[in-house]
């Protein structure tokens, strides 16, 4: 099977300079969702028909498995599919999808293709309580589809029909090529309607069959920001439902956003207003507190992430305790039972098992050993204004509060750094290292008085 994706719409109602099919849904362009469905079907060829802002679309999403066809000017859906014909092979089937219908499901498309077989024209239709704006499916007395009439061309009786065309169809490429070559634009819009091929199929005694989607939401298109927001909520509810069916506890399934892939072990609990981006893996028994953002991370079993923490491109071992208000940045690796408390930031660092930085610290470009205690206010000074340098802290080190480690520097195994130390040279193992100005008490000193 070959797939044609129509993605040339202008999207004026979006009121955006970004082409409509690039508007984000669940963290990626709408068109990407449709491409994912086509790829899951193992389509032999995928052709994207682009128009408005097309070069931007192509630059953003171009890939080796995609063909591109430009529609200029834009003269309707039939004209759009015509532009893809040079990329299609007679003897195969063509599936027509839409770049602004992002929730179409693969099982639905598989049933549609099966219904088409090798010779039939298969249409995806839905029944709506309010079919305003959609082309109506017209059937004869025997229930056979005879044609589709667009709403602007429909009579009052035809407008009362509730079964509507979604635009998604499967047809033999050879027949599609012939039908499209016979299209006329003598209609209210002066456009070449793809739907007119149904009448041609009926006239040629080609069987026209219909399939209903698993959910109406699969066929909903997006023309405005409110509609985009509606589909976002539908999509997130579907994700939340699947997570709960897999055993994840969601404190409120209406308040989670997954903008990528979330893989969870057993007995995972996620509190409200959490956002997961990219690929995130949560081990057994992981608990994520409220208002956390987790991006491209792997979190080990039994780890607890307290509220308002941000985790990005991080690997965490089991039984860690993170937050609240902690931040791990790209390149962070945490061993077992690592504690990062409130207002601790870690970047591009490896922290080994059982080490702790419980509050108010910055650990950047560092290698931290096991059982290290990092006191409040500790900073690894890793940047000299031009280059980054690493800090090495060996096992069993105790770092007092308000300590600065000016990289490159090494703290030996079992060393203790006194509070307030500014370390500019390596600290030897098993020794106390302190660098402080001598404490003075000045007798008779008085605070300045504000002049009147």
UniProtKB/Swiss-Prot annotation:
It is found in: Cytoplasm. It catalyses: alpha-D-glucosamine 1-phosphate + acetyl-CoA = N-acetyl-alpha-D-glucosamine 1-phosphate + CoA + H(+); N-acetyl-alpha-D-glucosamine 1-phosphate + UTP + H(+) = UDP-N-acetyl-alpha-D-glucosamine + diphosphate. Its main location: cytoplasm. Residues 247-452 are annotated as: N-acetyltransferase. One of its GO terms (biological process) is cell wall organization. Homotrimer. It is an enzyme of class 2 (transferase). It holds the Pfam family NTP_transf_3. Pathway: Nucleotide-sugar biosynthesis; UDP-N-acetyl-alpha-D-glucosamine biosynthesis; N-acetyl-alpha-D-glucosamine 1-phosphate from alpha-D-glucosamine 6-phosphate (route II): step 2/2; Nucleotide-sugar biosynthesis; UDP-N-acetyl-alpha-D-glucosamine biosynthesis; UDP-N-acetyl-alpha-D-glucosamine from N-acetyl-alpha-D-glucosamine 1-phosphate: step 1/1; Bacterial outer membrane biogenesis; LPS lipid A biosynthesis. Acetyl-CoA binds at residues 376, 382-383, 401, 419, 436. The gene is glmU. One of its GO terms (cellular component) is membrane. GO terms for molecular function: glucosamine-1-phosphate N-acetyltransferase activity; magnesium ion binding; UDP-N-acetylglucosamine diphosphorylase activity. Its EC number is 2.7.7.23, 2.3.1.157. NCBIfam families: glmU. Residues 1-225 are annotated as: Pyrophosphorylase. In the N-terminal section; belongs to the N-acetylglucosamine-1-phosphate uridyltransferase family. Its cofactor is Mg(2+). Binds 1 Mg(2+) ion per subunit. Mg(2+) binds at residues 100, 223. Keywords: Acyltransferase, Cell shape, Cell wall biogenesis/degradation, Cytoplasm, Magnesium, Metal-binding, Multifunctional enzyme, Nucleotidyltransferase, Peptidoglycan synthesis, Repeat, Transferase. It comes from the Bacteria. This is Bifunctional protein GlmU. The active site is at 359 (proton acceptor). Signal peptide: none annotated. CDD domains: GT2_GlmU_N_bac, LbH_GlmU_C. Residues 226-246 are annotated as: Linker.
């Amino acid at each position: 099977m070959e797939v044609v994706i129509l993605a040339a719409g202008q999207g004026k109602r979006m009121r955006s300079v970004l082409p409509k099919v690039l508007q984000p849904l669940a963290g990626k362009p709408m068109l990407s969702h449709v491409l994912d469905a086509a790829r899951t079907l193992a389509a032999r060829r995928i052709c994207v028909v682009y128009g408005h802002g097309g070069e931007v679309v192509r630059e953003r999403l171009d890939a080796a498995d995609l063909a591109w066809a430009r529609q200029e000017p834009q003269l309707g859906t039939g004209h759009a599919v015509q532009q893809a014909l040079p990329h299609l092979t007679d003897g195969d089937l063509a599936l027509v999808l839409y770049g602004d219908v992002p929730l179409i499901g693969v099982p639905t498309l598989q049933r549609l293709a099966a219904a088409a077989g090798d010779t039939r024209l298969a249409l995806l239709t839905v029944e709506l309580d309010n079919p305003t704006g959609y082309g109506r499916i017209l059937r004869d007395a025997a229930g056979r589809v005879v044609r589709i009439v667009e709403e602007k061309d429909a009579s009052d009786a035809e407008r009362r029909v509730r079964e509507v065309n979604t635009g998604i169809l499967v047809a033999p490429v050879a027949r599609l090529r012939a039908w499209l070559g016979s299209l006329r634009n003598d209609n209210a819009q002066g456009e070449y309607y793809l739907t007119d091929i149904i009448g041609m199929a009926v006239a040629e005694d080609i069987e026209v069959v219909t399939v209903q989607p698993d959910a109406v939401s699969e066929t909903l298109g997006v023309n405005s920001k409110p509609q985009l927001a509606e589909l976002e909520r539908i999509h997130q509810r579907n994700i939340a439902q699947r997570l709960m069916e897999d055993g994840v506890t969601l404190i409120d399934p209406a308040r989670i956003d997954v903008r990528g892939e979330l893989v969870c072990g057993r007995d995972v609990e996620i509190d409200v207003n959490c956002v997961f981006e990219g690929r995130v893996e949560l081990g057994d028994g992981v608990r994520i507190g409220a208002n956390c953002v987790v991006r491209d991370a792997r979190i080990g079993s039994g780890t607890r992430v307290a509220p308002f923490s941000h985790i990005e491109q991080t690997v965490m071992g089991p039984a860690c305790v993170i937050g609240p208000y902690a931040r791990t940045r790209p390149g962070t690796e945490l061993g077992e039972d690592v504690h990062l408390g409130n207002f601790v930031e870690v970047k591009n660092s490896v922290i080994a098992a059982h080490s702790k930085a419980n509050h108010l610290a910055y650990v950047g470009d560092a290698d931290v050993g096991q059982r290290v205690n990092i006191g409040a206010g500790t900073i690894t000074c890793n940047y000299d204004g031009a280059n980054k340098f690493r800090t090495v802290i060996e096992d069993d080190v105790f770092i007092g509060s308000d300590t600065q480690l000016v990289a490159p520097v090494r703290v030996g195994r079992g060393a203790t750094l006194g509070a307030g130390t500014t370390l500019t040279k390596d600290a030897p193992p098993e020794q106390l290292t302190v660098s402080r100005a001598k404490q003075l008490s000045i007798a008779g000193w008085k605070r300045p008085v504000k002049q009147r």
